[in-house]
């Protein structure tokens, strides 16, 4: 207090013996200390406000990620990535259909087909929310001879969201690349509306219709084309597993493995199609609840019925159902169980009985696919080994025979699927 008191006395011009000055000195100290504290607080507050305003200005001036989605640094790099099957994302800032197509089309340059090379639209196959399917013929520089394709068209009037989704699906095929057991993209026309996506045409068509035709052939004895043996079922099944392995390598799964979602060539080479669920996983990281609700319940694994996240283990369960479909020549699964009761049926630890046309070896493979716990089901590689081992001793002579013909409407009711979904023989995206 001595040095501070002396200083305050000097400021007040007081003598050491002045009693009144001592009182004034105390009053002075009471005033100056709070004043200094308030002043310091105001200076600190001003500095904080200045730093905040400065940060806000710099944030507004610097270009942020809003309105874009991982746009590559250079256009040349984007085109190079697209050519090598890498994931290429498009700018989202375009607010018009025309602007979006101008930005998207250069990145799909290697897939573009001049419209004049689309020679003929033969017939409409199906019309749905994601576009209309047609049979068409086209030529390319590599294939000057006309070839049949399935053309998917997105026609006016259409909004920006639908256009972005259509282009996204083309990009998804580009990202996947080629695999002999997946339906291939043949080209596209995206510089203006209507937009076209051309996919390979697979004859005779979808596997479910093929299996039903095998029944008719047995009834009428019309030749050998549609004769199917146990060994051929293993042949088809192994190739479907290879397609699923290919998807898994890209961190994807199919989500709806079924005979209706497989196309078959005349040499019995299967092509997995209807990749819409895999596209959703690729684009959004998960399957939307709206899309999940459209999948027939009888093909779903228990965890899917319980609304748990989908995975490749669910595809393994569905693969067991596919084997059942093939060995019964297209019978609906769980024929005695209503679709809405399938979860309760499985919760009682019940599975389908062995069909009379099914060997014990094949039924054992089905049962390991239908284990309740997804972790106890075999991996794709293990399942492939089981099929290869079983096929070595499989019957290649006896033709599978199921004399009853299928009525599609009755089948749809028992299987729990929409009748219109099996009214045409092509299932593509």
Swiss-Prot record:
Q: Which named protein is this?
A: Tyrosine-protein kinase STYK1
| Family (UniProt) | Belongs to the protein kinase superfamily. Tyr protein kinase family.
* Domain Protein kinase, chain residue ranges per copy: 119-390
Catalytic activity reads:
L-tyrosyl-[protein] + ATP = O-phospho-L-tyrosyl-[protein] + ADP + H(+)
Top-level EC class = transferase
Species this protein is from = Mus musculus (Mouse)
Keyword Transmembrane helix belongs to the record? yes
Concerning SUPFAM superfamilies, the annotation shows: Protein kinase-like (PK-like)
């Amino acid at each position: 207090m001595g040095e501070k008191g002396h200083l305050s006395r000097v400021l007040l011009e007081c003598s050491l013996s002045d009693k009144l000055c001592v009182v004034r000195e105390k009053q002075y100290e009471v005033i100056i200390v709070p004043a200094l504290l308030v002043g310091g607080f105001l200076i600190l507050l001003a500095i904080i406000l200045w730093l905040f305003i400065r940060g806000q200005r710099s944030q507004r001036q610097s270009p942020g990620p809003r309105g874009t989605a991982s746009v590559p640094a250079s256009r040349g790099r984007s085109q190079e990535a697209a050519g090598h099957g890498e994931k290429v994302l498009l700018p989202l800032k375009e607010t018009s259909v025309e602007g979006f197509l101008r930005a998207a089309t250069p990145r799909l340059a290697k897939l573009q087909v001049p419209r004049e090379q689309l020679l003929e639209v033969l017939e409409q196959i199906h019309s749905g929310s994601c576009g209309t399917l047609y049979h068409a013929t086209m030529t390319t520089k590599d294939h000057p001879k006309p070839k049949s394709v399935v053309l998917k068209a997105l026609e006016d009037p259409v909004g920006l969201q639908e256009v972005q989704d259509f282009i996204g699906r083309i990009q998804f095929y580009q990202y996947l690349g080629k695999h002999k057991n997946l339906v291939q993209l043949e080209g596209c026309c995206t510089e203006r509306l209507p937009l076209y996506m051309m996919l390979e045409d697979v004859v005779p068509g979808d596997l479910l219709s093929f299996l039903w035709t095998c029944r008719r052939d047995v009834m009428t004895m019309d030749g050998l084309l549609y004769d199917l043996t146990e060994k051929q079922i293993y042949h088809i099944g192994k190739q479907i597993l290879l397609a699923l392995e290919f998807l898994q390598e890209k961190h994807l799964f199919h989500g709806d493995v079924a005979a209706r979602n497989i196309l078959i060539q005349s040499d019995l080479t299967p092509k997995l199609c209807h990749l819409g669920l895999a596209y959703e996983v690729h684009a959004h990281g998960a399957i939307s609840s709206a899309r999940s609700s459209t999948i027939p319940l009888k093909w779903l694994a228990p965890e899917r019925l319980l609304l748990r996240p989908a995975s490749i283990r669910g595809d393994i369960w569905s693969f067991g159902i596919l084997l059942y479909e093939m060995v019964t020549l297209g019978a609906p699964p769980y024929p005695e169980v209503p679709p809405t009761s399938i979860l309760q049926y499985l919760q009682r630890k019940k599975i389908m009985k062995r069909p009379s046309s099914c060997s014990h070896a094949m039924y054992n493979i089905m049962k390991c696919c239908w284990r309740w716990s997804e972790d106890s089901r075999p991996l794709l590689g293990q399942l492939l080994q089981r099929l290869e081992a079983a096929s070595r001793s499989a019957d290649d002579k006896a033709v599978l025979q199921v004399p009853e013909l299928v009525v599609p409407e009755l089948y749809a009711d028992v299987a729990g699927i929409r009748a219109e979904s099996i009214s045409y023989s092509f299932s593509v995206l």
